[in-house]
UniProtKB/Swiss-Prot annotation:
It comes from Buchnera aphidicola subsp. Cinara cedri (strain Cc). GO terms for cellular component: cytosol. HAMAP family: LeuA_type1. This is 2-isopropylmalate synthase. Mn(2+) binds at D14, H202, H204, N238. Belongs to the alpha-IPM synthase/homocitrate synthase family. LeuA type 1 subfamily.
Length: 516
């Protein structure tokens, strides 16, 4: 039977320390509830002595969290321990997490003590914490740079004093997986009473090895891993729990371990943390990045179409991923991907010439970069429109905004070679006003689904790049605009979309003609 690995989440404590602004009470509640749904065993919710606000947050969460064990951090100081316990008084199931520097550097330069004094402080603190709870975790801060002999001594002492979990942090992300595994192995071989406590690890990512170090520690016998969702944390962050969890899941048979995590909640939890912490998830972020389950190479796309397992070791649906794009159409895509997208749109092989379509597809992909389904349709059934000028052109626009938030937009839109349409609308904000005016001008009933703004370059002359996705007749269309003025970039993006919609309509007309 596989042994259970305890998952200890410190997103609300160590993760929050990395944020530019503190989380609000409601944001902390939403993240805590998401972590509970995920099935995290222990949630470290704060450092109560650090501020009155943190104390109140811990107190609030101690009333809300029911299924996971709640935990608070405390230095090995009497006042810290009392305040930590007081903050969690409303919880029936809490842990006090004590920490104290143990490396020569921390002992001498930070704490200004000798190691015997460190052991005395640690033992006294564990004994004090036992007055409030039987669940006590002790962390040897900077264990990765602590001499093994000192680790043996302090771990044996705190376990004897009543610590139920002993944490071995690689506080500055210094060790390699081989080195860290050796440290853990040596502890199990030399600390006499080590089996009387759960041994835990808390790895930082300064050298990019936090997850690898955590897994190597499991191989050595560790039964608790600490980390944060999305790898949040000071400096380079902590071990990313979603990566730890899925590594344990994928290799559960060889590692002979398991967790109580509901992996179906991983994607949702990650998005909640990303949203509230204002930390975008990189496209290529392991497990949760949008590119993880997307394929652009023609060879890979062909392999995925035959069997997803050829190039995917995780089923995206198993972790709650629903909004991923499986096959990106680029100049690297092969015929199999083009054929797959046409079939997905409902077209049979007999409806078009695949070889001709693929030749035209490559030409357009070299110019445009990424190709969408409506581009394929246009190439297959109305190829000539790809070489025509844009039907809609924005001749002029002006936006007047008021402090009330209302903005009035006036636009002049050229339609085809002759028609000029002039429209004015008042709406909430300048971008919405522009979009509503363009909507009225074209009579397209479209819904803005996504708006993304990013800077291309630095300083005041940087270009604003706007990417949008709109829905028209249950179909998504993509648009891009680039300008030093973000309102102009937004307008260009919408006009870009309007042209795609117009071209799509011409394709439909051509299909109707061919069917007659």
């Amino acid at each position: 039977m596989n042994e259970k690995i305890i998952i200890f989440d410190t997103t609300l404590r160590d993760g929050e320390q990395a944020l530019l602004t503190s989380l609000t009470s409601n944001e902390k509640i939403q993240i805590a509830l998401a972590l509970e749904r995920l099935g995290v065993d222990v949630i470290e919710v704060g450092f109560p002595v650090s501020s009155p606000g943190d104390f109140k947050s811990v107190q609030m969460l101690s009333k809300i969290i029911k299924n996971s064990k709640i935990c608070s951090l405390a230095r090995c100081l009497p006042n810290d321990i009392t305040i930590a316990a007081d903050a969690m008084q409303f919880s029936k199931n809490f842990r006090i997490h004590l920490f104290l520097g143990t490396s020569d550097l921390h002992v001498s330069s930070k704490l200004k003590k000798n190691f015997n004094e460190i052991i005395e402080m640690a033992v006294a603190s564990v004994k004090q914490a036992k007055k409030f709870t039987n669940d006590i975790e002790f962390s040897c801060e900077d264990a990765g740079r602590t001499t093994l002999q000192n680790l043996y001594c302090i771990i044996e002492a705190v376990i004897k004093a009543g610590a139920t979990t002993v944490n071995i942090p690689d506080t500055v992300g210094y060790t390699t997986p081989t080195q860290f595994k050796k440290i853990i192995t040596m502890l199990f071989n030399h600390v006499k009473n080590i089996h009387q406590a759960i041994i835990s690890v808390h790895c930082h990512n300064d050298l990019g090895m936090a997850v690898a170090n955590s897994i190597s520690a499991v191989e050595a016998g560790v039964r608790q891993i600490e980390g944060t969702m999305n790898g949040l944390g000071e400096r380079a962050g902590n071990a990313a729990l979603e990566e730890v969890i899925m590594t344990l899941n994928v290799h559960k048979n060889s590692l002979k371990v398991s967790t109580d995590i509901n992996i179906k909640e991983i994607h949702r939890t990650s998005k909640i943390v990303s949203q509230f912490c204002n930390t975008p998830i990189p496209l290529n972020k392991a497990i949760i990045g949008k590119n993880v389950f997307s394929h652009s190479s023609g060879i890979h796309q062909d392999g995925v179409l035959k069997n997803r397992k050829n190039y995917e070791i995780i089923d995206p649906n198993s972790i709650g991923f629903t909004d991923y794009c499986s096959l990106n159409l680029t100049s690297r895509s092969g015929r199999a991907a083009v054929k797959h997208h046409m079939k997905k749109m409902g077209y049979e092989n007999s409806d078009y010439n695949l070889n001709e379509l693929y030749i035209d597809f490559l030409k357009l992909a070299d110019k445009k970069g990424r190709i969408f389904d409506y581009d394929l349709e246009a190439l297959a059934f109305f190829k000539k429109q790809q070489n025509t000028e844009e039907y809609y052109k924005l001749e002029y626009f002006d936006v007047q905004s008021k402090l009330s938030g209302l903005s009035t937009a006036y636009i002049v839109l050229i339609c085809g070679s002759q028609t000029n349409i002039q429209k004015a609308t008042t709406y909430n904000g300048p971008v919405d006003a522009i979009y509503q005016a363009l909507n009225k001008a074209t009579l397209y009933s479209i819904v803005l689904k996504k708006f993304h703004l990013e800077a291309n370059g630095e300083g005041k002359d940087a270009l604003g790049k706007v990417n949008i996705i709109v829905q028209y007749k249950l179909r998504n269309f993509h648009g891009v605009g680039l300008a030093t003025d973000i309102i102009e970039a937004s307008a260009q993006a919408m006009v870009n979309v309007l042209n795609y919609i117009w071209k799509s309509q011409q394709v439909n007309k051509e299909l109707e003609r061919l069917q007659k």
